[in-house]
A protein has these predicted regions:
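Acidic/polar, glycine-anchored loop/turn motif associated with catalytic or activation segments
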Residues: 406
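Amphipathic alpha-helical coiled-coil segments and their boundaries
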Residues: 3-6, 392, 399
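Small/polar low-complexity and glycine-rich loop motifs
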Residues: 22, 33-388, 393-395
């Protein structure tokens, strides 16, 4: 019986050393989760014997339990390196079509625009409609970003302006001289206060057209004339009015727009080699004020842009994948999917930093980052192995002494 005790102790200690050695070997493996050997005693059973007469016959390894604690995050600066801060697993489609799960987010784009792991598995997520930002599928599929798809130019339809016109400005006609007695000198007219600001708008082919807006005080209280200039000549386009509190009262924007605004007619020429027609641009004036402070522009933006080529992608904390284009635009192209399990320790490790589901793990619960109990993503970072190297070295020495004691 003593031989059985020692042999079981050797086997258990050897298995423990295997587990510890595997942990130490993967101390620098991205997304690796350490394991722990768990032991149970063995007892010889006697039919009909009294409980106190059972004799222990040694030890056995009851389980090798994976430890899914969070690993540290290391910043890499690579936008396709993604770490999960919290619970969840990236969902993968392996080359043979089967499903796998991983915590290692060191992804790559292949020549076809597929987002893949180092082992060639495709990363799964949800396709997004760029126009609405909403999902177009309920089941995750392989994420793909073909580099050959440029973003088309968009003609400007609206300019949004926010600025203050100085309420202290006025337009005085002046006073002529009088002969007296006593004579009074002439008071010259005060120059009309004029302010201006410029912005580029885009025609239907994405060509930038510079537009300058001028605002000139009239002789009427709380009233300003508006001019636009596409070249050198200024063209009147309307009048802005305010109440005594400095809030804009007109003009009312043309339908179907609401609020306050003016319409500009923008002629792409010159130069205009393709003879594009003039197009209208609504200038939204809802946030224009007339207070007793200097003229200042706080916002001047427009909704058009030139065409652009894909230059890269960013992955947000929510898993939303934003494509970056050479024209400065960004567009939602997909969303990374995550999965979780009722019993993550029931997952089976299959190598290449991957796990597959088993009966013990339960079926995956799918979702997206920051949704419910799922963790957030951090682009430009990777999750380190959660192996505590110091603790593992101590465990190894203890396991070696145990092995020696049973030899």
């Amino acid at each position: 019986m003593a031989f059985q005790h020692g042999l079981s102790g050797l086997n258990a200690a050897s298995k423990n050393l295997d587990v510890i050695g595997h942990n130490i070997a993967n101390a620098n493996t991205t997304g690796f989760k350490a394991s722990r050997a768990e032991f149970a005693d063995m007892v010889a059973s006697a039919i009909g014997g009294a409980g106190g007469s059972n004799v222990g016959i040694g030890v056995q390894v009851a389980a090798v339990a994976q430890q899914f604690t969070q690993g540290n995050l290391t910043v890499t600066g690579n936008t396709l390196d993604v770490a999960i801060n919290g619970s969840g697993f990236f969902m993968l489609q392996q080359p043979d079509g089967s499903s796998a799960y991983t915590r290692a987010g060191n992804f790559k784009l292949d020549k076809d625009g597929d987002l893949k792991t180092n082992s060639g598995a495709r990363v799964l997520g949800y396709p997004i409609d760029p126009a609405t930002g909403l999902r177009t599928a309920t089941v995750p599929g392989p994420l793909n970003f073909p580099s050959s798809q440029p973003i088309a130019a968009k003609q400007t339809t609206t300019v949004t302006a926010a600025f203050n016109l100085d309420a202290r400005a006025y337009d005085a006609a002046g006073v002529p001289a009088t002969p007296g007695p006593p004579p009074t000198p002439a008071i010259p007219p005060t120059p009309r206060a004029t302010y201006g600001t410029s912005i580029n708008v885009f025609d239907s082919q994405g060509v930038a057209v510079p537009v300058t807006l001028y605002f000139q005080k009239t002789a009427t209280d709380n009233e300003w004339e508006v001019y636009d200039s596409l070249d050198t000549a200024a063209t009147p386009v309307g009048t802005i009015t305010f109440d005594n509190n400095g809030a804009i009262t007109g003009p009312v924007a043309p339908a179907p727009a609401t609020g306050f605004g003016l319409t500009l007619s923008v002629d792409p020429s010159p130069p205009n080699p393709n003879n594009l027609p003039a197009f209208n641009v609504l200038v939204n004036l809802d946030d224009v004020t007339q207070f007793g402070s200097k003229f200042a522009v706080s916002d001047l933006s427009q909704d058009g842009y030139a065409s652009g080529e894909l230059t890269g992608i960013n992955i947000e904390a929510s898993g939303m994948i934003m494509a970056r284009y050479s024209n400065g635009m960004t567009r939602a192209e997909g969303q990374v999917a995550l999965a979780n399990f009722r019993n993550p320790q029931g997952l089976m490790a299959v190598g290449n930093n991957n796990w597959v589901e088993t009966f013990e793990s339960g079926q995956p619960v799918m979702g997206t980052p920051t949704d419910g109990n799922f963790g957030a993503l951090r682009s430009g970072a990777l999750e380190d192995s959660n192996v505590d190297l110091t603790a593992e070295l101590v465990n190894m020495m203890t396991a070696q002494r145990t092995y020696q004691a049973n030899a």
